[in-house]
Amino acid sequence: MVLGKVKSLTISFDCLNDSNVPVYSSGDTVSGRVNLEVTGEIRVKSLKIHARGHAKVRWTESRNAGSNTAYTQNYTEEVEYFNHKDILIGHERDDDNCEEGFSTIHSGRHEYAFSFELPQTPLATSFEGRHGSVRYWVKAELHRPWLLPVKLKKEFTVFEHIDINTPSLLSPQAGTKEKTLCCWFCTSGPISLSAKIERKGYTPGESIQIFAEIENCSSRMVVPKAAIYQTQAFYAKGKMKEVKQLVANLRGESLSSGKTETWDGKLLKIPPVSPSILDCSIIRVEYSLMVYVDIPGAMDLLLSLPLVIGTIPLHPFGSRTSSVSSQCSMNMNWLGLSLPERPEAPPSYAEVVTEEQRRNNLAPVSACDDFERALQGPLFAYIQEFRFLPPPLYSEIDPNPDQSSEDRPSCPSR
């Protein structure tokens, strides 16, 4: 008898949303099929699936142990959210010499259904960062006697829903800052900045209306600007590693001495980025809106307003939808492309992004005085769910400047 061959082994998910992307939340049932195509008859010991969800953090730091001694310190941490195994065909027996229990699969295409329930407890949103990731996947393993197993892994996306309609995320965010410039024994007038946004919570694709007033009573030319930043924080062995990513920005008009500029709802659009991750013990993803004044030859005047990027968009006034899935479906279109099937081990960050790309796209910001330098870098943080989409293009110059605000002298004469 001529034994057949395995032509293909694939995994497909039953999607719960209109965009046909496998996206789930805690408590959902993940279901799908393992698709097997064979040419000729084959004998099978077992067809298994293994589903797992986990967050993992890893980075290294160089240490000096003496004048001529150095070593590398590894920091790793992992949190497992679920671990499910099931046998679709056959049994666990590993003895190839035992003829009993082998299954015969005939030539053609075959489907084997699987399903499992995600935990009811909160799950971290799928994410791929500089020093860690949150991944969810299903692996299929086909075991045959006297042959190496055929394995395939496919990821799916999990969103831990954040409803921006909660009172804490609907509250306005505001602040005021002032700075006086000094040069030797001379002191110029102050530069003042006040800014306000209507709420704390937003979803990708929305535009933030920025209300601000910038008053320049110094002797220098200054430029008001705004930027959205993503902060990734990774925790392991009592240590923390932080990376800041620039997401989007805009620039106002230059202000000469004695001038004032008012932003009456200047718009800054949020590109497709990962939602905030606030409930994971080893990975945290937060966002902030930086409204600041670029001052040549001095530290920038910075005002930071916290943001939360959610998954359930703002309800129109007076209307409520009936379910979380329907609320979230309108926000799934920007997922765009499904995650590909993978070999057994998911690719590392370094395998997906070259070292040169990583240096260019993930420039960290270490301090406020590096803020302007960071604004010259790329404007899109690397996110796993959206890594197959081209990065959005943004200009530092606002394409729709507010023409209503005019420079006007407002500082007291000196």
Curated annotation (Swiss-Prot):
GO cellular component, as recorded: cytoplasm; early endosome; endosome; lysosome; plasma membrane
Motif (PPxY motif 2): 391-394
Subcellular location: Cytoplasm; Cell membrane; Lysosome; Endosome
Keyword Repressor tagged: no
Alphabetized UniProt keyword annotations: Cell membrane, Cytoplasm, Endosome, Lysosome, Membrane, Repeat
GO BP field: fat pad development; heat generation; negative regulation of adenylate cyclase-activating adrenergic receptor signaling pathway; negative regulation of cold-induced thermogenesis; negative regulation of heat generation; negative regulation of locomotion involved in locomotory behavior; positive regulation of hippo signaling; protein transport
Family note: Belongs to the arrestin family.
Entry function: Adapter protein that plays a role in regulating cell-surface expression of adrenergic receptors and probably also other G protein-coupled receptors. Plays a role in NEDD4-mediated ubiquitination and endocytosis af activated ADRB2 and subsequent ADRB2 degradation. May recruit NEDD4 to ADRB2. Alternatively, may function as adapter protein that does not play a major role in recruiting NEDD4 to ADRB2, but rather plays a role in a targeting ADRB2 to endosomes.
Protein name: Arrestin domain-containing protein 3
Organism expressing this protein natively: Rattus norvegicus
